[in-house]
């Protein structure tokens, strides 16, 4: 099994269509395809940061998106994710951004989404059918408990 740490350059070129997840020590939280994860970050940047990547949520948008969240920054990351979750509730599902670098791109499923999805805070569902933000919080809590860095890795 080859593991590749994401960085913006590598991520966009090589890992976009691979399965990715959050890893803390030997705990792995599967997310889904890399383009799905990029969509979450794109949606946050476009809708909550006025398209200025990392301007409001630098720990998640800059540090973690590069591939690793230092254990010393986990509290800040948790607070940023709480704000993101709250603020995304104000946006309808049609405000999802699949790729901030190409706003014409749409999710593979188009507008065919579950009626349970009522806003952008519950739009993102992992490949295992779990709420993405819940899984994200679980990974951050594990990082805090174990005092080990969280990484984004492909399998």
PLM regions with names:
Residues 2-138, 142-155:
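Acidic (Asp/Glu-rich) sequence patches and key acidic residues
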């Amino acid at each position: 099994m080859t593991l590749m740490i994401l960085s913006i350059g590598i991520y966009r070129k090589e890992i976009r269509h691979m399965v990715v997840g959050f890893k803390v020590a030997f705990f792995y939280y599967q997310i889904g395809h890399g383009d799905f994860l990029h969509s979450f970050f794109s949606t946050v940047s476009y809708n909550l940061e006025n398209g200025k990547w990392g301007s409001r949520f630098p720990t998640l948008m800059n540090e973690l998106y590069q591939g690793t969240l230092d254990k010393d920054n986990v509290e800040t990351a948790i607070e940023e994710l709480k704000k993101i979750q709250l603020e995304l509730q104000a946006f309808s599902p049609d405000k999802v951004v699949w790729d901030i670098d190409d706003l014409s791109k749409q999710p593979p499923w188009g507008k065919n989404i579950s009626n349970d999805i009522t806003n952008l805070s519950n739009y993102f569902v992992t490949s295992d059918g779990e709420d993405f933000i819940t899984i994200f919080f679980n990974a951050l809590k594990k990082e805090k408990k174990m005092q080990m860095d969280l990484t984004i890795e492909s399998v």
